[in-house]
Every structure is written in structure tokens, then in C-alpha cells.
């Protein structure tokens, strides 16, 4: 969960939790099973205001589906910021790598999560690993992707897995969240909040939940 404005409070069955605000990230690993809840912080609920956040679900490899549940509270100061060429803007490395810079989020498979702030009129070319799945969400403003695809606020652009370059042109000041990962090429079965690799595993997850193996909040 990435917060752009407002505050989010979290707690879960590992005993972890806390409040995150603008620029902060919470990175939770469900693994073998976790109970959690997210809500406005008490202080934010009392004063009111805009809450803008992005939540991503990253599929774990089959071999890691039963990993120990975990939680990372990543503050804005923990996230490295890269100044982009030609005064184009900045890029925050939340997960994965950008050049020699590594993000703080712990991942189980190769992936990148980059939070970009682009200046109006800027042109930017980003290297992307050949064959990876790549998508971007325009959080604010508008951009043109690869010279042909305009995208405005709250729009998602899914890119082809072929090619290793991504070109962005900012039509206005813009915030863009870019997500890219190496395909797992494994079956996916989802049911409610459960995501596994087979119907049998889904049934096992439901039994674990009903028997209290996910713990308590």
C-alpha cells in the first residue's frame, strides 16, 4: 500500500502495525496466512481530508506461497530517490533496482516498483528487462507512453513483454507508478482473498483460515 495523501493505519496477526502517511509504504507478505485490517488513522478521521493511496497485490511463486507472514513499514525517508536526467523529475525505488539503487521492500521474485514524479514537457526513456510484465498507473496528470498511447489520471497502461525500452512524455506535471516483474508462468487460482496455484490449495487455505491458523488480531 502506497499513500499519496492522508493516513492509513494497519494492524495484523503478526502483531505488527502502525500509521503511514504521504510517501510511506506498507509491504505485507501474506504467505502461509495472515489477518489484517486497514483503516483511516484516528487523527485523520477526526480532521478529515483527502485519502489517496494505491494498493498492489504481488503473486508469490509457488515455492514461497507458505512463507512466514511478514510486514514492513517503509517510511518516506527509507525510500531512495533518484534524480532523473535532463531535469525530468525524480524516481523513488520502492522495490527492485534502478541502476545501482536498490529499494527497501523485500520481494520473493524479481520485480520493480518505481514511483515517478515527472515535470511537464519532460521526455524520459527507461530500460526494462526483456520479457518482463510491465504496467503503469497515472496517479496524477497525464503522459504519453511510447509516443502513441496517451494516459490520464487513474488510467492503467499494460505494455507488451517484447522490447526493453519504455518512453514517457509528460503532458503535464505527472505522478506515475510503474510496476514490472519477471513472469512466474504458474497457474493462478483465486477465491475471495485467497490466491494459490490450485483449487486444492484454495480449499486448504480456507480450512486453515476457519481453524484459526491465520492467528488473531
Task: List where the protein language model places each region.
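Jelly-roll (double-stranded beta-helix
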Residues: 1-217
Amino acid at each position: 500500500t502506497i499513500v499519496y495523501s492522508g493516513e492509513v493505519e494497519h494492524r495484523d496477526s503478526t502483531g505488527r502495525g502502525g500509521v503511514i502517511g504521504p510517501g510511506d509504504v506498507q509491504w505485507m507478505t501474506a504467505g502461509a496466512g495472515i489477518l489484517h485490517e486497514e483503516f483511516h488513522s484516528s487523527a485523520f478521521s477526526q480532521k478529515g481530508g483527502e485519502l489517496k493511496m494505491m494498493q498492489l497485490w504481488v503473486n508469490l511463486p509457488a515455492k514461497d506461497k507458505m512463507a512466514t507472514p511478514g510486514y514492513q513499514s517503509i517510511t518516506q525517508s527509507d525510500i531512495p530517490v533518484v534524480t532523473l536526467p535532463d531535469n525530468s523529475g525524480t524516481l523513488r525505488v520502492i522495490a527492485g533496482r534502478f541502476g545501482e539503487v536498490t529499494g527497501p521492500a523485500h520481494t520473493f521474485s524479481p520485480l520493480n516498483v518505481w514511483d515517478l514524479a515527472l515535470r511537464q514537457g519532460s521526455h524520459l526513456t527507461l530500460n526494462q528487462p526483456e520479457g518482463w510484465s510491465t504496467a503503469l498507473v497515472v496517479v496524477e496528470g497525464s503522459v504519453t507512453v511510447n509516443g502513441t498511447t496517451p494516459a490520464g489520471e487513474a488510467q492503467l497502461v499494460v505494455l507488451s513483454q517484447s522490447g526493453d525500452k519504455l518512453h514517457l512524455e509528460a503532458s503535464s506535471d505527472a505522478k506515475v507508478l510503474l510496476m514490472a516483474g519477471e513472469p512466474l508462468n504458474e497457474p493462478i487460482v483465486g477465491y475471495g482473498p485467497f490466491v494459490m496455484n490450485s483449487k486444492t490449495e484454495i480449499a486448504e487455505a480456507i480450512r486453515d483460515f476457519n481453524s484459526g491458523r491465520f492467528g488473531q488480531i
